[in-house]
Amino acid sequence: MIARSKKTTCWVVGTLVLAASVLLSAPVARAEQLAPWRDTAVPALSLTALDGATVDLTAQSGNLVIVHFFATWCEPCRDELKSLERLAAAQEAHPFRILAVDVGEPGDRVRRFLARNEISVRYPVLIDFDKQAMRAWGVEMLPTSYVLDRALCPLWKVAGALDWDVDPILSMIVHEITERAASTEGQKNCTVKGGMR
């Protein structure tokens, strides 16, 4: 009787954990879900990366920037991190940066996750252990990504997983990196909102 009760409890807990991960993980997004991000300024972002360095968003000025929020338990996040890695490799010679932000987990867990899933990233992976950045940026589901232009002004937001290195998304990114470079030349950076809540 006790064994059956324990089995039932484990099954219920497992089901609840699975349901929570499904609800909190956004479905795969399409190009039309890369919606204009209408804020006039972006929140502050300064976090410690897995290599121990402090990475500040303001230092990325002059680059098109993708700020990508994820977690190791988020199933769609795994493929999206690999997609972002392919995009980073393809655009390595251009003014383009990716900042991946893990939400609510210790660095060791993130390192194991990346190794286990053979995700070799050439962009900083930042740790938002207390979820302050997640709250400041208004992240409601994972994955969520924000695209900033080269003056660090809000450009696009997408809630849900996206395949970044295929068209039409790839063409949109390349256009912003190359064709619009002249239009942001000398443009004053958008004001970064005050500290993270």
Per-segment meaning from a language model:
Residues 69-86:
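Conserved redox-active cysteine motifs that mediate thiol-disulfide chemistry
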Residues 99, 114-151:
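Short, internal strand/loop/helix patches
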